[in-house]
């Protein structure tokens, strides 16, 4: 049994949303890794049905909070990734762009770019997703039992730490090193493919195969409506 996201979102004295979670041992969640551990237990956005119309707004607030917390981590570890010829620079830029693709978040991304200007050397299109992003779309998903807002949250977790991919006992897809490595080296590509599969059930991996139609994924209706061994519907991104 999981928790609703709203159990962990509150507001500070300045009116800004904050993430407030405590582990069972009494320790407060403080690092971005702590945040991800807590969020991995979230199974719905709103605990109260009356709050359902605000679901997307809660996920949007979370995206900003997560990126600000991740910025602290980037600051603490910049010797490991922040360098003109460091390949991790590209990964971080694509993590930010993946967040833009998923939620349209701009302010927190600008904050990271201002602190780490070398990221601007990586070609990205952050602003393109401000109005047109995965979270804001209203089309039904191919996976009928999926919730778009929850799926967005789950992908954000995996963008920041691909180790959360395929951690379930029952999955729509089996353990796949290809997917893990994709999220690790190009997070934007990972979320685009996952989002397309969830939305339409079809994805052509022409970038990997060299041309269209050679490497194509198509989800059958049986898979889209798959149930776990316990009999309940599958509803997480894995």
Regions found by a protein language model. Give the residues of each.
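Active-site nucleophile-adjacent alpha helix/oxyanion-hole segment immediately C-terminal to the catalytic cysteine
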Residues: 66, 82-88, 92-106, 111, ...
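Long non-globular sequence segments
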Residues: 1-118, 192-195
């Amino acid at each position: 049994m999981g928790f609703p996201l709203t159990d962990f979102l509150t507001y500070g004295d300045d009116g800004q949303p904050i993430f407030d979670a405590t582990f069972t041992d009494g320790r407060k969640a403080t690092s971005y890794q702590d945040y991800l551990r807590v969020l991995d237990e979230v199974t719905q956005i709103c605990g109260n049905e009356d709050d359902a119309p605000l679901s997307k707004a809660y996920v949007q607030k979370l995206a900003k909070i997560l990126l600000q917390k991740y910025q602290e981590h980037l600051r603490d570890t910049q010797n490991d990734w922040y360098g003109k010829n460091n390949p991790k620079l590209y990964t971080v830029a694509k993590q930010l762009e993946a967040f833009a693709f998923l939620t349209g978040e701009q302010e927190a991304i600008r904050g990271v770019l201002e602190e780490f200007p070398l990221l601007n050397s990586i070609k990205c299109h952050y602003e393109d997703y401000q109005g047109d992003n995965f979270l804001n779309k209203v089309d039904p998903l191919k996976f009928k039992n999926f919730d778009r807002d929850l799926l967005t949250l789950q992908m954000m977790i995996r963008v920041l730490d691909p180790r959360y991919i395929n951690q379930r006992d029952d999955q729509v897809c089996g353990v796949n090193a290809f997917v893990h490595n994709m999220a690790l080296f190009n997070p934007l590509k990972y979320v685009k493919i996952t989002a397309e599969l969830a939305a339409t059930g079809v994805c052509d991996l022409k970038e990997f195969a060299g041309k269209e139609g050679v490497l194509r994924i198509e989800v059958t209706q049986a898979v889209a409506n798959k149930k776990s061994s316990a009999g309940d519907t599958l509803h997480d991104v894995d």
